[in-house]
């Protein structure tokens, strides 16, 4: 008798995606992060839903409603810190997922890659809006500084900023619309994730060797479900350790002070996962140039399939490209560190050098290195 999972239309859909899915037999732990991102999304939607039940999206009550959630709501502090640290874990998994895609050449599945870039941008938008909601000092000034960047757009910039703010400054209307978008975006992310999976299953997963694996595939269940569950346990262990022992480790102390439009914090900075892009933004003296550099720091990912010059998909057997790849990772760590430092010498210079190296490595050094490696293949 045919199992129901192969006959029922809905069960068949789940079966083809998570049970009988043909998967390369040699994919490593680096392929775990896709499922972890799914777990992060479920966690964020669940905790966010409970927080939204008690949150008040108004400038006069937002800060006190967060204090109320933390102090008075049953396990409110747990839900709040799971949500805040869950966002950090989300971005850690996201960066590792993109890093794996770059290393093993998964970007050659272009539709999947491009939807992934849209997912990254949407997630960044959701996280930024979420950071504004507690209405602390860093929330308020972060919102003011980042939304003010829209004024760099010629002709329509100023009108656009006032339209986003809902007035002449960041206030209650801004908070209300940010809360609205922050609530709806995770559901848009879920829809985009479904599309991402749909296109991925059209081509099948890549593998560490970067070669076709049609002749050597195994079913996703039980082999990779067990592997993913192990990854999920390690993820939850890390998240719970962070939440229960150091919940404010990745946050900013300034956000425990009520937003005050008359007092600017000594150093305005976003959450740690945006610091690399913030450092690139600050490295350009011109406002419009900085905004363009900020956008390009993410959108440059869309150019990577075009810049791929190697005859091999994966970097597994390309030592020179591997060297450049790890140089790029080190450069991103440097940018993240610089983004959290004050705007003074020598941090400005280091940030500018790191920003130039970031774009130079991706646009010029990596394609040239790939061409050199192609030549080296002929010599062997």
Curated annotation (Swiss-Prot):
<dbReference type="GO" id="GO:0008121">
    <property type="term" value="F:ubiquinol-cytochrome-c reductase activity"/>
</dbReference>
<feature type="transmembrane region" description="Helical">
    <location>
        <begin position="77"/>
        <end position="98"/>
    </location>
</feature>
<feature type="binding site" description="axial binding residue">
    <location>
        <position position="97"/>
    </location>
    <ligand>
        <name>heme b b566</name>
    </ligand>
</feature>
<dbReference type="Pfam" id="PF00032">
    <property type="entry name" value="Cytochrom_B_C"/>
</dbReference>
<dbReference type="InterPro" id="IPR048260">
    <property type="entry name" value="Cytochrome_b_C_euk/bac"/>
</dbReference>
<feature type="transmembrane region" description="Helical">
    <location>
        <begin position="33"/>
        <end position="53"/>
    </location>
</feature>
<keyword id="KW-0830">Ubiquinone</keyword>
<keyword id="KW-0812">Transmembrane</keyword>
<feature type="transmembrane region" description="Helical">
    <location>
        <begin position="288"/>
        <end position="308"/>
    </location>
</feature>
<keyword id="KW-0249">Electron transport</keyword>
<keyword id="KW-0479">Metal-binding</keyword>
<feature type="binding site" description="axial binding residue">
    <location>
        <position position="182"/>
    </location>
    <ligand>
        <name>heme b b562</name>
    </ligand>
</feature>
<dbReference type="GO" id="GO:0046872">
    <property type="term" value="F:metal ion binding"/>
</dbReference>
<protein>
    <recommendedName>
        <fullName>Cytochrome b</fullName>
    </recommendedName>
</protein>
<dbReference type="InterPro" id="IPR005798">
    <property type="entry name" value="Cyt_b/b6_C"/>
</dbReference>
<feature type="transmembrane region" description="Helical">
    <location>
        <begin position="347"/>
        <end position="367"/>
    </location>
</feature>
<keyword id="KW-0349">Heme</keyword>
<dbReference type="InterPro" id="IPR036150">
    <property type="entry name" value="Cyt_b/b6_C_sf"/>
</dbReference>
<keyword id="KW-0408">Iron</keyword>
<keyword id="KW-0472">Membrane</keyword>
<dbReference type="GO" id="GO:0045275">
    <property type="term" value="C:respiratory chain complex III"/>
</dbReference>
<dbReference type="InterPro" id="IPR027387">
    <property type="entry name" value="Cytb/b6-like_sf"/>
</dbReference>
<feature type="transmembrane region" description="Helical">
    <location>
        <begin position="178"/>
        <end position="198"/>
    </location>
</feature>
<dbReference type="GO" id="GO:0005743">
    <property type="term" value="C:mitochondrial inner membrane"/>
</dbReference>
<keyword id="KW-1133">Transmembrane helix</keyword>
<keyword id="KW-0679">Respiratory chain</keyword>
<keyword id="KW-0999">Mitochondrion inner membrane</keyword>
<dbReference type="Pfam" id="PF00033">
    <property type="entry name" value="Cytochrome_B"/>
</dbReference>
<comment type="function">
    <text>Component of the ubiquinol-cytochrome c reductase complex (complex III or cytochrome b-c1 complex) that is part of the mitochondrial respiratory chain. The b-c1 complex mediates electron transfer from ubiquinol to cytochrome c. Contributes to the generation of a proton gradient across the mitochondrial membrane that is then used for ATP synthesis.</text>
</comment>
<comment type="subunit">
    <text>The cytochrome bc1 complex contains 11 subunits: 3 respiratory subunits (MT-CYB, CYC1 and UQCRFS1), 2 core proteins (UQCRC1 and UQCRC2) and 6 low-molecular weight proteins (UQCRH/QCR6, UQCRB/QCR7, UQCRQ/QCR8, UQCR10/QCR9, UQCR11/QCR10 and a cleavage product of UQCRFS1). This cytochrome bc1 complex then forms a dimer.</text>
</comment>
<dbReference type="InterPro" id="IPR048259">
    <property type="entry name" value="Cytochrome_b_N_euk/bac"/>
</dbReference>
<feature type="binding site" description="axial binding residue">
    <location>
        <position position="196"/>
    </location>
    <ligand>
        <name>heme b b566</name>
    </ligand>
</feature>
<dbReference type="InterPro" id="IPR005797">
    <property type="entry name" value="Cyt_b/b6_N"/>
</dbReference>
<dbReference type="InterPro" id="IPR016174">
    <property type="entry name" value="Di-haem_cyt_TM"/>
</dbReference>
<dbReference type="GO" id="GO:0006122">
    <property type="term" value="P:mitochondrial electron transport, ubiquinol to cytochrome c"/>
</dbReference>
<feature type="binding site">
    <location>
        <position position="201"/>
    </location>
    <ligand>
        <name>a ubiquinone</name>
    </ligand>
</feature>
<dbReference type="GO" id="GO:0016020">
    <property type="term" value="C:membrane"/>
</dbReference>
<feature type="transmembrane region" description="Helical">
    <location>
        <begin position="320"/>
        <end position="340"/>
    </location>
</feature>
<keyword id="KW-0813">Transport</keyword>
<feature type="transmembrane region" description="Helical">
    <location>
        <begin position="226"/>
        <end position="246"/>
    </location>
</feature>
<feature type="binding site" description="axial binding residue">
    <location>
        <position position="83"/>
    </location>
    <ligand>
        <name>heme b b562</name>
    </ligand>
</feature>
<dbReference type="InterPro" id="IPR030689">
    <property type="entry name" value="Cytochrome_b"/>
</dbReference>
């Amino acid at each position: 008798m045919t199992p129901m999972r192969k006959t029922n239309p809905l069960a068949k859909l789940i079966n083809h995606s998570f049970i009988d899915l043909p998967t390369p037999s040699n994919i490593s732990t680096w392929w775990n992060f896709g499922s972890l991102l799914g777990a992060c999304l479920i966690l964020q939607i669940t905790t966010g839903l409970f927080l939204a039940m008690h949150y008040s999206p108004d400038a006069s009550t937002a800060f006190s409603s967060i204090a109320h959630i933390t102090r008075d709501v049953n396990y409110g502090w747990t839900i709040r810190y799971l949500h805040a640290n869950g966002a950090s874990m989300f971005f850690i998994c996201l960066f590792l997922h993109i890093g794996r895609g770059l290393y093993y050449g998964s970007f050659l599945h272009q539709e999947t890659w491009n939807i992934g870039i849209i997912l990254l941008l949407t997630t960044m938008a959701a996280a930024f809006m979420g950071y504004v909601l507690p209405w602390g000092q860093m929330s308020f000034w972060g919102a003011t500084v980042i939304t003010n960047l829209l004024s760099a757009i010629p002709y329509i910039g100023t009108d656009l900023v006032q339209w986003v703010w809902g007035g002449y400054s960041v206030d209650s209307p801004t908070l209300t619309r940010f809360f609205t978008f922050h609530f709806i975006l995770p559901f848009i992310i879920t829809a985009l994730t479904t599309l991402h999976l749909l296109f991925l299953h059209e081509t099948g997963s890549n593998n560490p060797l970067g070669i076709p694996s049609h002749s050597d595939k195994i079913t996703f269940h039980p082999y990779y479900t067990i592997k993913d569950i192990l990854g999920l346990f390690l993820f939850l262990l890390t998240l719970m350790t962070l939440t229960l022992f150091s919940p404010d480790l990745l946050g900013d102390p300034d956000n425990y002070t009520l937003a005050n439009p008359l007092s600017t914090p000594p150093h305005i900075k976003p959450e740690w996962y945006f610091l690399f892009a913030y450092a690139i933004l600050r490295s350009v003296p011109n406002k419009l140039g900085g905004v363009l550099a900020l956008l390009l720091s993410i959108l440059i990912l869309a150019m990577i399939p075009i810049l791929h010059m190697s005859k091999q998909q994966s970097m597994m057997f390309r030592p020179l490209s591997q060297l450049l790849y790890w140089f790029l990772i080190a450069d991103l760590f440097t940018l993240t560190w610089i983004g959290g430092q004050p705007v003074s010498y020598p941090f400005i210079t280091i940030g500018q050098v790191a920003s130039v190296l970031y774009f130079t490595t991706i646009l010029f050094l990596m394609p040239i290195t790939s061409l050199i490696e192609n030549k080296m293949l002929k010599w062997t």
